Amino acid sequence: MNGVSSRKVIYAALPRKLVAILTLAAISCVGAIIGGVGVASAQEVESNKMNEILNFRQYSPTFASAGQPTREQLQIIKDSGYERVIYIAFSTVGPAIPEEDQLVKALGMDYLHIPVDFNNPTIRDFNTFADAMQRESDRKTLLHCQVNARATAFSFLYRVIYQDVPVADAKRDMNSVWTPNQVWKDFIFSVLAANDKSPECEGCDWSVPEPR
């Protein structure tokens, strides 16, 4: 007796109600598989859209930094599961969105603004950011400024000081966006020193770019 005819005999011997239950279960399994593929595809699309934000960098499942997102990209940030947006530049310069706080809150995300002077960043600025991160360290957070210069520097410091990321790895991520100038090199070194951390690492070059 071949396999097909064997299956026919087995199903014929089963009660009709049981056959119906087995059929529904099989349909449900197929639906779940198809649904799972759909969810994965949607998440992948959202991730790709996040990469369209200026200089977007993802450090962990709950922490990323970027330059200034557009109004439309704020919705993408929300759809990608972010719960908090921290902005560390002035709201009156460049591509800043003056009403960003209102837009972010309207989308159901938390918003924190720490206006950091690019020409005079302070340890207090960084500590304000770090304190907020430490209070709710599990909240998925996007840190941003205008072009992700301030934000990558703050991200470098936070990851090295609070997440024990090797200096070389964190510096490589920062340098993929920019090389800090003398003001920011001095700032980074002072924050590291205040937290008993060294900027030195094998292969690290902290040379500053030539002034333009």
Predicted feature residues:
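Cys-dependent protein tyrosine phosphatase-like superfamily
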Residues: 2, 27, 31, 35-141, ...
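Bacterial N-terminal signal peptides that target proteins for export
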Residues: 3-26, 35
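A phosphate-binding catalytic loop at a beta-strand-loop-alpha-helix junction
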Residues: 141-154
